[in-house]
Amino acid sequence: GGTPNTAQQEAYYTDETGIPWVRTMDLTNELLTSVEVYITEQALQDTACKVLPPGTVMVAMYGGDGTVGKNGLLGIPAAINQAVCGLLPSDSVFPEFMFRFIQFFRPFWMVGAESSRKDPNISQERVRNAPVLLPPMEEQLAIVEFLRLQSDRFDALSAEAQRAVELLRERRSALISAAVTGKIDVRGLVPQPEAVAA
């Protein structure tokens, strides 16, 4: 990837009618279908940027320890900046399988990046040389389907837990409001100290 000169905004950067340009901050370890920054055709001609196809697996190579190793799966044609490594799966690899497999490496890449220098990073070579186990395509698809189902299940449980937390907060707030406004008499609920005989 590459970064068009930001001093030439009009020549290289545009609105949503341009070419999506992926930066490390766009990577959320999920399918990427939208970005915040778009570049022009002129940017493609004048820089190392090139448009990558949907199904490209992307990995953040630098940007600090919270960013190194973050990844995404392109769901749209897009260009990437120089801090992102794009991996184009071959015909023997299902893109989503490779995407999920690459996620496994993030903790290892982060450890290596932290020991590399003051500003943590990993090299494109290190990403490209990551050993990827390739089961038959049928098994790759089965693994991806299993992960999708488990992810959907996890998302549903997470949403249910969030609703429960919100309901408990509402009830707590209502209870406090009722106690403060006198709608609930709490005088008999707290034991009173015995009067000391004089």
Language model feature labels by segment:
Residues 129-198:
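Amphipathic alpha-helical coiled-coil/heptad-repeat segments
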Residues 77-85, 115-141:
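A short glycine-rich beta-alpha junction/loop motif
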Residues 27, 39, 127, 180:
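Hydrophobic pocket-lining residues within nucleotide cofactor-binding pockets
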Residues 23-24, 40-105, 123-124:
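A short beta-sheet element
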Residues 45-46, 116, 162:
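Short, solvent-exposed loop/turn positions at domain surfaces
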Residues 31-36:
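Cytochrome P450 core scaffold surrounding the K-helix E-X-X-R motif
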Residues 1-29, 45-47, 123:
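Low-complexity, Lys/Gly-biased intrinsically disordered segments
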